[in-house]
């Protein structure tokens, strides 16, 4: 049996106060309902949480529940999806993909993207990888000078989750390192997003030599110039979340 996991936590005062907090509950409900249906179609369990289970300053690191919580050990594959993701194509079964450890979409400048890729190798980002003992790895299927898997859509196998629980570094050590969210006086340490879940997990994947399957944009279509650009999962990142209410509400 496989499982789909989503979560949403109310803001806790750490990080930016985005305007989407004003309407996010509707977005959450829409995404939940779509993925409940997707789970039912593909014979998977659906699990949603709004409880804090991971000891962390930042809500982003609740995603680490994927591997920290032994509750999920009874499931084969775990699909994690952010609450701003919609399965536009219900027929395609992501659980049929052959995954050894984890699978996700590598950030890059896909020609269909609405916004440019913000995840490129920079000195501050390279410093973080080096600080935590991780090599810089380039993607195999797309062009970019660093492989950064977008953590908004991920498949994790049971073996990968158990392995991560045993091996991965403490996420708070990563979050506390040169973090401009926590220390406003820090200069030239990179963007605040360098301190949160996406780079942390990618550092861990590289450090502990996880087998990373690179998915095509059809499984994590971040905002595109053309809403009709074909995909299985659409990911309405950043300030595009209202689109979920407009299109699916």
Predicted regions and their residues:
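Catalytic core and acceptor-binding pocket of nucleotide-sugar-dependent glycosyltransferases
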Residues: 141-248
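N-terminal anchoring/stem segment of glycosyltransferases
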Residues: 1-75, 237-244
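GT-A fold catalytic core of metal-dependent nucleotide-sugar glycosyltransferases
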Residues: 56-126, 154-161
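Short, flexible, basic/aromatic active-site loop/helix in glycosyltransferases
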Residues: 126-144
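A structural signal for short, well-ordered beta-strand segments and their strand-loop junctions
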Residues: 4, 46-49, 79-82, 103-105, ...
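Short, polar loop motifs at secondary-structure junctions
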Residues: 31-33, 87-91, 218-221, 238-240
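A general structural motif
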Residues: 1, 74-76, 100, 212, ...
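Short amphipathic alpha-helical segments and helix-helix/interface helices
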Residues: 32-36, 67-69, 91-95, 198-202
